[in-house]
Amino acid sequence: MDYYTILGVAKTATPEEIKKAYRKLAVKYHPDKNPGDAEAERRFKEVSEAYEVLGDAQKRESYDRYGKDGPFAGAGGFGGAGMGNMEDALRTFMGAFGGDFGGNGGGFFEGLFGGLGEAFGMRGGSEGARQGASKKVHITLSFEEAAKGVEKELLVSGYKSCDACSGSGAKTSKGVKVCDRCKGSGQVVQSRGFFSMASTCPDCSGEGRVITDPCSECRGQGRIKDKRSVHVNIPSGVDSGMRLKMEGYGDAGQNGAPAGDLYIFIDVEPHPVFERHGDDLVLELPIGFVDAALGIKKEIPTLLKEGTCRLNIPEGIQSGTVLKVRGQGFPNVHGKARGDLLVRISVETPQHLSNEQKELLRKFSETEKAENFPKKRSFLDKIKGFFSDFAV
């Protein structure tokens, strides 16, 4: 279903209107207000997914342009939409009300619960098992690479899982024990009104376990600094501003937590001949006034394998006329029909004429007829009428 429809707002809605609509629906369908109601839980995840996209300017722009699948369907799409579990939906919920999962939040929930540090089972704290940070890199492609698609190797700096302890943070399996306070759950639960709040266990920082004999290689963190090569397959048809998400290619998490994601932002270099407008290509083709008058067939460049195609320019063509060559444009990133090549004709007036050339043009001018220049005749007729209106 369309995200705007899910939130009940128009496509022209302001960010404030989108946020207001989401807050109203999120409170209505929150699982703590609807215990055991599977449909309410589904709707809560659904509105959270919609807000995750429409509440972010960049994601919203991509959604408006390409739809729900995004330009990189199968590679992450909007990078965050798709509430597969309640934790993601609750994180979106808290963010919309000004909450912060690290215990530094304010706004609505802090006022409601009195300094809420952790809520609804969200894991936070300054220590313990935390998901690895996401990484962001920019990659510049040539115009041809964007058209054909390309494979690239990127060198990414960050953290990888510690090989010595397999990411556990402990020297041996005996160097870890279950947390006595939370009994391994990583959370301590409190009830206030109809809300049940699960805050991070202060003894194990939400990990559910305590490392008694830390790994000497990573000092109990479960990860170490690293540089690695990442192979990226970029599809044909990409454009500047598009984003590719590679799940799990960011920093490794601490103490066995999931890795973050890698976001690759695309920049495409301009082309010396073509301009891109969506999936269409625009080519400015200068021709002489004789060719424009008599018509001509010309070989013009394309991005296809053949490299050129023949264009039939009809006689009497005017400067600014656009001729369309179907299917010779840019490939569509979704695999749909290729765009068209739009050839804009530019009739060039000759310069630096010889005396002989000037004489030939004068002779041609003497043979001119009104039907040779319909625009000129139309203009003269108009100004005759204009001056006659002011005749005394």
Swiss-Prot record:
Q: Zinc fingers (CR-type): which spans?
A: 149-227
Transmembrane region positions? none
What is the protein's given name? Chaperone protein DnaJ
The record's comment on cofactor binding reads: Binds 2 Zn(2+) ions per monomer.
Q: Name one GO cellular component term.
A: cytoplasm
Name its co-factor(s). Answer: Zn(2+)
Organism of this sequence? Chlamydia muridarum (strain MoPn / Nigg)
Its subcellular locations are:
Cytoplasm
Specify which residues bind Zn(2+) 1 according to the UniProt entry for this protein: C162, C165, C215, C218
Q: How does it assemble?
A: Homodimer.
Which HAMAP family would you find in this protein's record?
DnaJ
Q: What does this protein do?
A: Participates actively in the response to hyperosmotic and heat shock by preventing the aggregation of stress-denatured proteins and by disaggregating proteins, also in an autonomous, DnaK-independent fashion. Unfolded proteins bind initially to DnaJ; upon interaction with the DnaJ-bound protein, DnaK hydrolyzes its bound ATP, resulting in the formation of a stable complex. GrpE releases ADP from DnaK; ATP binding to DnaK triggers the release of the substrate protein, thus completing the reaction cycle.
Location of the J domain: 2-67
Keywords, A to Z, come to: Chaperone, Cytoplasm, DNA replication, Metal-binding, Repeat, Stress response, Zinc, Zinc-finger
What GO molecular function annotation could you give as one example from this UniProt entry?
zinc ion binding
Q: Which residues are Zn(2+) 2-binding?
A: C179, C182, C201, C204
Tell me which SMART domains the record gives: DnaJ
Recorded hits in PROSITE patterns, A to Z, give: DNAJ_1, DNAJ_2, ZF_CR
The Gene Ontology biological process annotation of the record reads: chaperone cofactor-dependent protein refolding; DNA replication; protein refolding; response to heat
Annotated family: Belongs to the DnaJ family.
Q: Which PANTHER family match?
A: CHAPERONE PROTEIN DNAJ (PTHR43096:SF48), DNAJ HOMOLOG 1, MITOCHONDRIAL-RELATED (PTHR43096)
Which parts of the chain are CXXCXGXG motif repeats? 162-169, 179-186, 201-208, 215-222
Identify the gene encoding this protein. dnaJ
Q: Which domain of life is it from?
A: Bacteria
Q: What Pfam families does the record tag this protein with?
A: DnaJ, DnaJ_C, DnaJ_CXXCXGXG
